[in-house]
Amino acid sequence: MRLPDVQLWLVLLWALVRAQGTGSVCPSCGGSKLAPQAERALVLELAKQQILDGLHLTSRPRITHPPPQAALTRALRRLQPGSVAPGNGEEVISFATVTDSTSAYSSLLTFHLSTPRSHHLYHARLWLHVLPTLPGTLCLRIFRWGPRRRRQGSRTLLAEHHITNLGWHTLTLPSSGLRGEKSGVLKLQLDCRPLEGNSTVTGQPRRLLDTAGHQQPFLELKIRANEPGAGRARRRTPTCEPATPLCCRRDHYVDFQELGWRDWILQPEGYQLNYCSGQCPPHLAGSPGIAASFHSAVFSLLKANNPWPASTSCCVPTARRPLSLLYLDHNGNVVKTDVPDMVVEACGCS
């Protein structure tokens, strides 16, 4: 968590404490509530910061060239909602930009990848759409182009396939052949020709792959953190009831449409931004809590500045679960990831 963010929420929580009156000794211990509109505005701002921090972004992506709808629909079918691969894994859909298609038989595809350095690639598949001009059997060879090279000998053969049907095809690529680009730019050359001896090939060469139309090629990548983190057991706690003054979980649903973020967050439509609130009598002090969380980190900072007596106990999260997101990054790639510790499931007294 960055220092400016801590200072921002420090100010907000101080405002909350002042609104609750001098009798309250902890910002989550109950007392007078904020007005509903003010509370909702605070929740929405917290949701924005929580999502950006969880995705390691400084600002929301600006989508200037969204992927074609047909290709995006196909890609989203590959990325179903739910948990991604174990070990803090991610799934990424990267759409191709055609940088050279002067020949009917050859195309150069450019992909702008945004794989974190702390992750490694372990699975890669290329999706291509074969046009109805398919002459019979097609021989497709996929090469990787090295950086700053233009000679024919600079390319490396990754895969070779024979195709006999039109429509979408998925081609597995060796993940080892796609690693090592520090710039994040990957270039693949497709050499697509009718199989030699095919009697149906007549006349001028015709384009066989849809590389620039609505069926845009894309890469399906799976990446995993180098040092997977351990999972946490899930625990639940009752939600706050109107007549319950003790520490409990207060539930808020945040719709991404309300945030104005539906253009880059594809799934889900929203999530539960829960937080902990209520009184912590002395006999509840020291209940299990999570020290290294966004919620309790701010409270710990406040307590370190000694605004309350040393014996004060605060209502903080004791269990969290991840949030699975499908979103478009700054390069227009579709990313599927589980953001850890996003949804509060249980609360307790620190």
Swiss-Prot record:
SMART domains: TGFB. GO terms for molecular function: cytokine activity; growth factor activity; hormone activity. Keywords: Cleavage on pair of basic residues, Disulfide bond, Glycoprotein, Growth factor, Hormone, Secreted, Signal. One of its GO terms (biological process) is negative regulation of adipose tissue development. Disulfide bonds join 240-248, 247-315, 276-347, 280-349. The keyword Protein biosynthesis does not apply. Belongs to the TGF-beta family. Inhibins and activins inhibit and activate, respectively, the secretion of follitropin by the pituitary gland. Inhibins/activins are involved in regulating a number of diverse functions such as hypothalamic and pituitary hormone secretion, gonadal hormone secretion, germ cell development and maturation, erythroid differentiation, insulin secretion, nerve cell survival, embryonic axial development or bone growth, depending on their subunit composition. Inhibins appear to oppose the functions of activins. Activin E is a homodimer of INHBE secreted by the liver that plays a crucial role in regulating metabolic homeostasis particularly in lipid metabolism and energy homeostasis. Plays a central role in the regulation of adipose tissue lipolysis by preventing the influx of fatty acids from adipose tissue into the liver. Mechanistically, signals via ACVR1C to activate SMAD2/3 signaling, suppressing PPARG target genes in adipose tissue, thereby reducing liver lipid content and improving glycemic control. Induces beige adipocyte formation and thermogenesis in response to cold exposure. Homodimeric or heterodimeric through association with alpha and beta subunits, linked by one or more disulfide bonds. Inhibins are heterodimers of one alpha and one beta subunit. Activins are homo- or heterodimers of beta subunits only. This is Inhibin beta E chain. It comes from Homo sapiens. The gene is INHBE.
